Amino acid sequence: MGTINNAFVLGHLGAAPTLRTTQKGTPVAELSIATNRRIDTDDNTTFDTTWHKVKLWGARAELAAAHLKKGDAVAVGGRMCSEEWTDSSGQARKRTVIVGQQLTLLGGSRRAAA
């Protein structure tokens, strides 16, 4: 039996995308996307925010860097990927990111809606 590795998030950017270029010249953008889950209780409503790290490659990376800013609404579809590295203090680190394969700029931001 096969497996499926599919992720989709629709949320708002916590910061403008960061763009860098690999040693081979490939553009890579990193995004931090917030999604909110509404929690209703008897006396109030709160929101639980989850932050998602996303990496975009090539033309998608350049598009994101050129057109997105903090607060913008965006949808990203892709696959989950684990990254491992050693930080500057020698600590082993690991995180899960979404490697974006589809990018939809939804226009507007939280700031514009407020």
Q: What is each stretch, according to the model?
A:
Residues 1-114:
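Single-stranded nucleic acid-binding surfaces, predominantly the OB-fold ssDNA-binding core
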